[in-house]
Regions:
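N-terminal Rossmann NAD(P)H-binding glycine-rich loop of SDR-like oxidoreductase domains
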Residues: 1-17
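Flexible, glycine-rich beta-alpha linker
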Residues: 27, 97-99, 122, 146-170, ...
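NAD(P)H-binding glycine-rich loop region in Rossmannoid oxidoreductase-like domains
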Residues: 28-70, 80-83
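Conserved catalytic-site region of short-chain dehydrogenase/reductase
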Residues: 56, 91-107, 122-128, 140, ...
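Short alpha-helix in the Rossmann-fold core of NAD(P)-dependent oxidoreductases
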Residues: 66-74, 90, 126-127
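Conserved Rossmann-fold NAD(P)-dependent oxidoreductase catalytic core, especially the SDR/UDP-sugar
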Residues: 75-120, 146
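Active-site Tyr-X1-5-Lys
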Residues: 76, 118-151, 167-181
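Glycine/proline-rich active-site loop of Rossmann-fold NAD(P)-dependent oxidoreductases
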Residues: 102, 141, 153-170, 180-184, ...
């Protein structure tokens, strides 16, 4: 029986599973609510995608919230998986866990070689700590828990907010409004950075494979 957290999010909606929960079903920052979820469903497998997320604007404006929410959500879910004897956990991290000044190409071994970018460091450190917790639990308890690091994801059910959304949906929304209102199409930044994206339904296919086959201690980049 597979439980997906963040079931109404970008990745969660693309995944197929027995049970999907969202923030409407439980506040995963609250340990008692997390216990209730695991008591009710008693999952054997968990795909953990839940978190407080957003684009550049949200990361800059809600640093404290992003850190607290994600630290609590990740810590509670991973600990509940241990207590309730979950056989396999796939925990989603983020490419922002990588250092800002790091030599390319990125590999899984480079996560802790420097500080993350200052635009979203609270979120990035919270995600890094989820990976550390997974590794610590593997080493102490011998659990088959793994971390995955997807590149920038896009697809149905994304956040199309211009101020707080991700790059592709925000640009789509901006372009739509510019066309509707016959105004200029404004794009933030210099246009020089290279960005990599992956479709949410491709993430779902890879995640299903990882759930069944991947057991290595190192996080795996999905790109």
């Amino acid at each position: 029986k597979t439980l997906v957290t963040g079931g109404t999010g970008l990745v969660g909606t693309a995944l197929s599973s027995d049970i999907k929960i969202s923030s409407k079903d439980a506040d995963l920052r609250d340990w008692l609510e997390v216990e209730n979820v695991f008591d009710q469903y008693n999952p054997t497998h968990v795909i953990h995608t839940a978190g407080t997320v957003g684009g550049l604007g949200a990361n800059m404006n809600y640093k404290g919230k992003f850190f607290f929410d994600n630290i609590m959500i990740n810590t509670n879910v991973i600990e509940a998986c241990r207590i309730y004897n979950v056989e396999k956990l796939v925990c989603f991290l983020s490419t922002c866990v990588f250092p800002d000044n790091v030599e390319y190409p990125l590999t899984e071994k480079k996560i802790h070689l420097g500080e993350p970018h200052n635009s979203n460091y609270p979120y990035a450190y919270a995600k890094r700590m989820a990976g550390v917790q997974i590794q610590a639990y593997r080493e102490q308890y011998g659990l088959n828990y793994v971390s995955v690091i997807p590149t920038n994801i896009y697809g149905p059910n994304d956040n199309f907010s211009i101020d707080n959304g991700h790059v592709i949906p925000s640009l789509i929304h901006k372009c739509y409004l510019a066309k509707q209102n016959n105004t200029e199409f404004e794009v933030w930044g210099s246009g020089k950075p290279l960005r990599e994206f992956i479709y949410s339904k491709d993430i779902a296919k890879i995640t299903n494979w990882i759930l069944k086959n991947y057991t290595d201690p190192e996080p795996i980049i999905l790109s």
